[in-house]
Amino acid sequence: MSKKKLQTIQAPKGVPDYIPPVSPEFLGVRDTFAHQAHLAGYEHIELPIFEDTTLFARGVGESTDVVTKEMYTFADRGDRSVTLRPEGTAGVMRAVIEHNLDRGQLPVKLNYYGPFFRYERPQAGRYRQLQQVGVEAIGVDDPALDAEVIALADRSLKVIGLTGYRLELTSLGDHTCRPQYREKLQEFLFKLPLDEETRHRAEINPLRVLDDKRPEIQEMTVDAPLMLDNLSDSSREHFELVTGMLDDLNVAYVVNPRMVRGLDYYTKTTFEFVHDGLGAQSGIGGGGRYDGLMAQLGGQELSGIGYALGVDRCLLALEAEQKRVTDGSRVNVFGVAMGSAAKREMVRIIDALRSAGISADMAYGDRGLKGAMKGADRAGARFALVLGDRELENNCVAVKDLAQQGQRDVSLDNLILEIQSAL
């Protein structure tokens, strides 16, 4: 009686795998973003994958779609409510408060990367497990810091080769002008024939209504009062200083007075990077200033500013522009051994190359020379090392330059130096 074959298991819906040849591009984008942050003085912070649910309910905003519809929340075995992190800023702020990082040199400048989780309808560029790289600068309310953060995000996108995006920004005001604007906006919204759920949202946070993507709501709110027209003098001055410094840095931008970010903690400067090559899911990253978030989470009255760039979205944007970026992790040397004695020696050679910092791999199994050389091509190797009885007798190896189609014998004693000088 034949044994029944077990059913295969697939990844959960909306959770992508990044496998070769895409994984080097994924790492290239992620690591480039992280490196640019490091160049600007942002130190790495590693955050928990899940947190106490209260952190996001209080920090992100109870009226946001993220909290009400998109979070992966569950009770652990101790019956504590925990949530897979939907974004990074709240977790960074929690860590800063918990470990007293705000008691030292300010601003605290941190960067992070990793997976985040939102229950959304999966489509191109929108996944339930999304990959982001972000920075946070905490503790100083300075327009120059806003300009630095925005310019850093802009530079990061340029370094990976993106050109077909635009930067949109606005100001969401501060505690002195937002209450009056809130009343004015609610007065406008309550005159509209809103459905019950939208009216409830207008009561809790009317800005959320302006963020509604339904065409009928967008049409009804086209004449809604705008925050940018109701800024306090200090908020207006702050925004003008930020845009002036962006001009000095040659960072191109478009002021979008109708912009509303999907998280409640943003104040003053708010921005988003948009790429029209992605269709409906055009945002590739964004961020802004958050003046009250730390106090809201039980810490000091300190402000901060940050951004998150979507690695998944940026990969799609690169594809739309027919560009590629890699992490440089290709195999430089691929070994091909002909015979058991040669294979034993090749194992030693490959290990010595790796110890010298040269990426190297070799053919395994009993493939012939032709099949093994195909492996070198698939690996993207610059050099192939061929070792057989002749080479063993002469204490050398045949080095094939796969880029320039040349071949020569190199002494085993000089091999590492020869490869290092050629790379």
From Swiss-Prot:
Q: What is its main location?
A: cytoplasm
Top enzyme class: ligase
Pfam annotation, one family: tRNA-synt_His
The identity of this protein, by name, is: Histidine--tRNA ligase
Q: Give the family, as the similarity comment puts it.
A: Belongs to the class-II aminoacyl-tRNA synthetase family.
The residues forming a coiled coil are none
Swiss-Prot/TrEMBL GO biological process terms:
histidyl-tRNA aminoacylation
Q: Which GO terms describe its molecular function?
A: ATP binding; histidine-tRNA ligase activity
Q: Which GO terms describe its cellular component?
A: cytoplasm
Q: What is the lineage of its organism?
A: Bacteria, Bacillati, Actinomycetota, Actinomycetes, Mycobacteriales
